[in-house]
């Protein structure tokens, strides 16, 4: 049998040299481009001068003239058929073009350097590079692609990253959509494209707290970097306190709590492997408090804790996305309401209830309304909303559909 074709093999520019495609849009599509929205949906494309392939450069012409109003990368198998990379005229898509975009993105993250050595350097559409993520874990970069259109450019992007960041290693990962389209075996969906990686568990720090990220097998690119500020905030609230971390995964909130002097932390997750990683992360740090892990369904375990009359000073509930499509929003809101109802019953007087959502399809107002329903269900008016948070600067949002992370801090009277 021959060698499997890896993700990196598909990135060979000789497989498909990007072509230029002239594009005319509907009035609605053109209005979207003029407003600098990064997405063009397929129904807003009136005509092209040739059949596009993924990665071709679409030159967008004005509806009533031949004036170029922007450039996008063609992604014909996606409902978002063109993803914009340049507005207000034309440009040459070459190494210098990408070097400028990456340089601007990295410069935005400079204020984080004294807080952490792990951050998102490129955040897709929000940095002018739709469907492309670059995360840094110490000296290792992890690039994740969410669209086939990036394949012809990866060799060039690799050189840009080497030039700007001088990493020891670069890992390339594909999301589920790309992996399925390329029919990649699981072991071929992640590939080391530069340097060596003796240990795929990379240690990093944030606000003095140490963690491990598995850059080959961990969720996303290895860790959930977007909650950094919230983890730090929970740590600040946890000194001498009893803390419950629900949907703990690798223990982000709980480890910050322990490192900041929490008396006790209980971490809940359905995955025994995740809880093992949480314990491993905790062990990287000095702490004197007790760390307990509970493996099982969070809803069931919270009910059990309530029946036992257990209460905590800080309760953090950070579930996975419950709404992966528009059809899932109502179910997600019901689950947020249920988690609020359960969480309120576990918070001691003067304690904190911290509720998070990572679903882009649920906005902050809907999220807060679900909390109100949860409070009403247990007939309590004891919780005051103290603070709402969103994205840290390495996950800054540049367009209306980019918001996904929201966290609400409630204090019990």
Task: State each model region's role.
Residues 1-138:
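Non-catalytic accessory regions of SAM-dependent methyltransferases
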Residues 122-135, 151-224, 232:
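Non-catalytic substrate-recognition/targeting regions of SAM-dependent transferases
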Residues 240-249:
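Conserved class I S-adenosyl-L-methionine
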Residues 250-263:
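Conserved SAM-binding loop of SAM-dependent methyltransferases across substrates and taxa
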Residues 264-269:
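Conserved SAM-binding motif I beta-strand of class I
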Residues 271-316:
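S-adenosyl-L-methionine
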Residues 298-376:
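S-adenosylmethionine
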Residues 338, 352-413:
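C-terminal catalytic and target-recognition region of SAM-dependent MTase-like enzymes
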């Amino acid at each position: 049998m021959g060698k499997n074709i890896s993700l990196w093999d598909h990135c060979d520019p000789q497989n498909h040299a990007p072509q230029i495609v002239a594009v005319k849009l509907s009035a609605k599509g053109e209005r979207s481009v003029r407003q600098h929205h990064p997405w063009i949906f397929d129904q807003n494309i009136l005509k092209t001068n040739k059949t596009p392939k993924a990665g071709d450069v679409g030159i967008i012409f004005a509806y009533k003239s031949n004036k170029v109003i922007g450039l996008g990368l063609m992604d014909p198998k996606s409902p978002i058929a063109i993803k914009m990379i340049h507005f207000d005229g034309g440009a040459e898509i070459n190494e210098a073009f990408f070097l400028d975009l990456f340089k601007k993105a990295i410069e935005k993250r400079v204020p984080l350097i004294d807080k952490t050595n792990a951050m998102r350097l490129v955040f897709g559409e929000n940095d002018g590079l739709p469907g492309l993520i670059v995360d840094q874990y110490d000296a290792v970069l992890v690039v994740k692609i969410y669209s086939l259109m990036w394949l012809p450019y990866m060799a060039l992007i690799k050189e840009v990253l080497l030039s700007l960041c001088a990493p020891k290693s670069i890992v390339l990962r594909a999301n589920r959509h790309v992996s399925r389209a390329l029919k990649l075996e699981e072991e071929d969906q992640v590939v080391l494209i530069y340097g060596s990686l003796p240990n795929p568990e990379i240690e990093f720090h944030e606000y003095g707290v140490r963690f491990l990220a598995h850059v080959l097998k961990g969720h996303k690119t290895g860790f959930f970097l977007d909650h950094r500020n919230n983890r730090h905030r929970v740590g600040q609230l946890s000194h001498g306190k009893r803390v419950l971390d629900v949907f703990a995964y690798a223990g982000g909130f709980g480890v910050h709590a322990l490192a900041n002097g929490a008396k006790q932390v209980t971490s809940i997750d359905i995955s025994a492997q995740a809880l093992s990683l949480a314990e491993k992360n905790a062990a990287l740090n000095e702490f004197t408090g007790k760390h307990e892990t509970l493996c099982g369904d969070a809803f069931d375990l919270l009910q059990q804790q309530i029946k036992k009359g257990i209460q905590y000073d800080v309760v953090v509930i950070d579930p996975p996305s419950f709404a992966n499509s528009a059809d899932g929003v109502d179910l997600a809101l019901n689950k947020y309401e249920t988690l609020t109802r359960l969480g309120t019953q576990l918070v001691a007087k003067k304690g904190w209830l911290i509720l998070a959502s990572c679903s882009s399809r649920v906005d902050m107002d809907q999220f807060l309304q679900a909390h109100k329903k949860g409070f009403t269900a247990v007939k309590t008016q004891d919780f005051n909303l103290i603070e709402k948070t969103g994205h840290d600067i390495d996950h800054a949002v540049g367009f209306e559909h980019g918001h996904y992370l929201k966290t609400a801090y409630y204090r019990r009277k």
